[in-house]
């Protein structure tokens, strides 16, 4: 990837400043640069005895250039850091980060003093209005771990049924057409995952509301842009600067819209004397009930809590599923092998999906884990353990090659063990984190992805347009599925009908 400047990165958003007087723009930039350079000693003081990678040059004012270098070539900079030692610090887009070799993963996996949620709250300015869903809150972790994961067996069938309905509506006018049709994959997968997730968490009324789904899809993206712009200001200026940044105002507007949608549902429940903390065996369970049960008297904001669940559930899952489909369309023989596995597991008849049957899709599980190995979701923040072991030839044979059978049978054995499963993390495969810092929603994500994959592979032929090859987008240490790549879909006869 060629080098680019911070100005180029933010170019799409500069039109927000077009109505400001030129003198005001210059003054704002000058004050920001000077204060950022003069009043941000934390960059220099953080564990100063460690090797420093990508520090600012002596002639650079502030850390804008250093951050731009990281965004343009983050992976190479991290690799250069490990040439200096197993622990080093470097300037990333969100400040100075201590980077650890993956051999330390087991040592820090249980350290209570480290918190991903708190680093997320710091990164995304959770104390500033508009960024409230990024607040460090154990309640969300408890809901995912003790409610959502434990209810998966009961969620699978309705999730499968909703997938069928969503696919039919998504491809309306296409069902009877046997010709190839072009689709922008990432956009449609994001909308599909948002729809299914919102229905699971919030039920039919809100879950099928297009306005709510738009908020779920847009809020996270808008928050990333707003958070990045706000990081350009030193901390002492952020509580004032956010009031004048258009992207921050947009976040507050989206939160107001979320309240407009959710508050009437809460009021209706109250009028109907339906308590939020419905009994665990009640016929209807949703995230409102789970939040109230897990809160156990703690004060929380139901609207912010619902958006917090959406932030952690939608974009990472849709990015993962998009990348898996891109990996598959480049390997038609693998699509055929997966279809054979699905038919073998489910038979040749109408059949209901269950969590147990999904767990028998071991080749699909291996494909998911290999896709994640090649393009993990993230590397963490503040203090992070590098995940470069995921591409280490000393650990994985031909690590640069996509091998869908890599985790299907453990090397040297004829068995498939727990460590090979998609949801099982290890220091050698940090796609979901590790230990107490592991992603609690990985079981729901794996279930949702497998259900969608089963239906898409059975119902549609899928391939790339001629001379097309999706690229993994690299910005800093983050890897993302191609945002613009398209696929061709065509309706096919399906060997088994899943419900």
For the regions a protein language model found, what residue spans apply to each?
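Cytochrome P450 heme-binding "Cys pocket" and the immediately downstream C-terminal segment
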Residues: 334, 424-425, 430, 436, ...
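Conserved cytochrome P450 K-helix E-x-x-R motif and the immediately C-terminal K′/meander segment
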Residues: 67-79, 348-384, 394, 419-426, ...
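Conserved cytochrome P450 K-helix/beta-meander segment immediately N-terminal to the heme-binding cysteine loop
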Residues: 384-419
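C-terminal helix/juxtamembrane-tail motif
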Residues: 1-17, 461, 477-499
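Classical protein tyrosine phosphatase
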Residues: 315-340
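Charged/polar low-complexity intrinsically disordered regions
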Residues: 91-96, 102-105, 110-202
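Cytochrome P450 heme-thiolate monooxygenase catalytic core
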Residues: 157-321
């Amino acid at each position: 990837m060629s080098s680019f400047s911070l100005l180029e990165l933010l170019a799409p958003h500069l039109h927000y400043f077009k109505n400001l007087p030129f003198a005001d723009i210059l003054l704002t930039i000058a004050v920001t640069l000077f204060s950022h350079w003069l009043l941000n000693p934390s960059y220099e003081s953080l564990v100063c005895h460690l090797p420093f990678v990508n520090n600012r040059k002596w002639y650079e004012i502030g850390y804008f250039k250093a951050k731009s270098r990281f965004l343009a070539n983050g992976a190479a900079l991290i690799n250069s850091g490990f040439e200096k030692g197993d622990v080093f610090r470097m300037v990333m887009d969100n400040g100075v980060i201590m980077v650890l070799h993956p051999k330390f993963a087991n040592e820090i996996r249980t350290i209570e003093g480290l918190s991903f949620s708190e680093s997320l709250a710091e990164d995304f300015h959770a104390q500033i209005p508009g960024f409230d869903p990024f607040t460090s809150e154990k309640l969300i972790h408890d809901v995912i771990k003790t409610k959502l994961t434990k209810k998966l067996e009961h969620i699978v069938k309705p999730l499968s049924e909703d997938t069928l309905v969503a696919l039919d509506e998504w491809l309306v006018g296409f069902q009877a057409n046997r010709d190839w049709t072009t689709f922008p994959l990432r956009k449609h997968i994001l909308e599909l995952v948002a729809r299914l997730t919102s229905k699971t968490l919030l039920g039919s009324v809100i879950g099928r509301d297009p306005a709510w789904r738009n908020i779920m899809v847009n809020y996270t993206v808008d928050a990333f842009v707003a958070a990045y712009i706000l990081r350009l200001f030193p901390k002492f200026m952020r509580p004032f600067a956010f009031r004048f940044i258009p992207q921050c105002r947009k976040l507050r507007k989206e939160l107001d819209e979320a309240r407009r949608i959710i508050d009437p549902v809460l009021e209706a429940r109250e009028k109907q004397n339906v308590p939020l903390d419905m009994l665990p065996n009640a016929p209807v369970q949703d995230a409102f009930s789970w939040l109230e049960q897990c809160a156990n008297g703690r004060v929380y904001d139901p609207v912010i809590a619902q958006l917090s669940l959406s932030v952690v559930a939608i974009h990472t899952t849709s990015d993962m599923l998009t990348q898996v489909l891109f990996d598959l369309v480049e390997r038609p023989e693998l699509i055929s092998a997966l279809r054979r596995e699905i038919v073998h597991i489910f038979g040749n008849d109408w059949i209901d999906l269950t969590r147990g049957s999904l767990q028998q899709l071991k080749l699909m599980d291996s494909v998911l884990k290999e896709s994640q190995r090649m393009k993990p979701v993230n590397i963490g923040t503040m203090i992070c353990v590098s995940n470069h072991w995921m591409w280490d030839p000393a650990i994985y044979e031909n690590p640069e090659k996509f091998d869908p059978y890599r985790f299907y049978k453990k090397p040297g054995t004829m068995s498939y063990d727990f460590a090979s499963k998609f949801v099982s993390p290890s220091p050698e495969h940090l796609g979901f984190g590790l230990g107490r810092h592991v992603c609690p929603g990985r079981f729901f994500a794996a279930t949702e992805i497998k259900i969608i994959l089963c239906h898409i592979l059975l119902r549609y032929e899928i391939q790339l347009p001629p001379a097309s090859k999706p690229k993994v987008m690299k910005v800093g240490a983050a890897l993302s599925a191609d945002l613009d790549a398209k696929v061709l879909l065509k309706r096919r006869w399906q060997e088994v009908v899943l419900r």
